[in-house]
Amino acid sequence: MKQFFEFLITTFLLLGLAAADEHIVYWNSTNSLFRNRQPTIEVRMGDVVRFVCPDNEEGRNDGEYLIVYEVTEFAMDDCALESHSREVIRCAPEGTAEKVLRTQQLSGGRREDWKKQKVPPKNVAQLIRQLNPIPNGKEYQPGQTYYYMTTSTGKANGTNHRMYGLCESQNMRLSMKVSASQPHPTRRAPTRRQEDFVTTASAELMGGQEDEDSDNDNAHLLPRDLEGSTNPKFRRPSQLETAGVENQQFMKVVQMAQAGKTGTFENEKEAIAQKSSEKDGWHPVNVQYVADLMNNAYQNADERISYQRDFEIHEENDLAVKSLEYSSSSTSLSTNFAILLAVIYVLY
């Protein structure tokens, strides 16, 4: 029953690995693979390696009976089993019950079919996986090499032989190199130039504004008409307002440059703004207001307390700058009159 459940689990795993590669190793002395000095196969994670026993039909006198072991590199080089060597498959003479069970599994359990069906050679599949759902199943790691061999003599009575055997006489040993799984091909996004395409993401980074095609799901693949874009951030320089250099002024500069002349020219907008500010007013105080204030101060001198400022106004037309200077005096009319009386009293 245990073997039946392991067979079912293996079958489902193989169905799930239909896209993986399957490597079949016919483990018999006539396989040309063992003619190489160092028999080696290369597999990837997710592949399946199937070891197939020799085809020992009933009545054949040249049948081979053996056991395949997973061993260390040192044991494979010496063709000698170690205590922890793992048995992979036993290609020994099968009993009647074992043949019947295996034939039923292959024929789907129908009695009338398995009696007529030829029994195929015994085989076992090794799933090259890092995690194996089968209890005590072998787990493999990428980048590692695993070694297999048989020390059986090939005869029925020499199946359990633990040294030399077919490993030495027929070079029946194998190195299996495991590499990483086949990488899946990645889809590369189409290459876009910044000046030809505008994406929704770029619009968000530049202020959260999008143009008229942003509602399209494939908007990032559509070329935009930058001349007619509603977003000023995506307009061409021809759409932007001038920075104060008018066309006539620019053409004049070009003509001067072609004639070999040098010099500077003033930004017209800034010049106009500066003249307008000078015409509208000046700082710090309005001249007419100060003049009126002074006249009122002199007319009411007798009624004011003894502190009055004398102002002097300057206007420099050549620099278009108006300034205001002042000097202070702490004398008043009443104070001067008192001093005059005191002087007359002393003299007389």
Swiss-Prot record:
**InterPro entries listed in its UniProt record:** Cupredoxin, Ephrin, Ephrin_RBD
Query: What does this protein do, in the record's words?
Result: Regulates the formation or stabilization of cell-cell contacts at several stages of epithelial morphogenesis. In early embryonic development, involved in ventral closure of the epidermis. During male tail morphogenesis, regulates precursor cell sorting together with mab-20 and allows the formation of distinct sensory rays. Probably acts as a ligand for lad-2 to regulate axon guidance of several neurons including SDQL, SDQR, SMD and PLN neurons during neurogenesis.
Classify the protein's membrane topology as the record does.
Answer: Lipid-anchor; GPI-anchor
PTM statement from Swiss-Prot or TrEMBL: May undergo proteolysis by metalloprotease sup-17 to give rise to a soluble form.
Q: Which GO terms describe its cellular component?
A: axon; neuronal cell body; plasma membrane; side of membrane
Q: What happens when the gene is disrupted?
A: Worms have widespread defects in embryonic morphogenesis of the posterior body and defects in postembryonic male tail morphogenesis.
Originating gene: efn-4
This protein's record includes keyword Nucleus = no
Where does it reside? Cell membrane
Q: Which protein are we looking at?
A: Ephrin-4
Q: What else is known?
A: In contrast to other ephrins, does not seem to signal through the vab-1 receptor.
| UniProt KW Translocase keyword | no
The UniProt subunit note reads as follows: Interacts with lat-2.
Q: Where is this region: Disordered?
A: 207-237
Question: Could you state one GO biological process linked to this protein?
Answer: ephrin receptor signaling pathway
Query: Which key words tag this protein in UniProt?
Result: Cell membrane, Developmental protein, Disulfide bond, Glycoprotein, GPI-anchor, Lipoprotein, Membrane, Neurogenesis, Signal
Originating organism: Caenorhabditis elegans
One annotated GO molecular function: ephrin receptor binding
Q: Where is the lipid attached (GPI-anchor amidated serine)?
A: 329
Q: What is the lineage of its organism?
A: Eukaryota, Metazoa, Ecdysozoa, Nematoda, Chromadorea
Q: Which Gene3D superfamilies match?
A: Cupredoxins - blue copper proteins
Q: Which segments constitute the Ephrin RBD domain?
A: 21-178
Q: Which family does it belong to?
A: Belongs to the ephrin family.
Q: List the disulfide bonds.
A: 53-91, 79-167
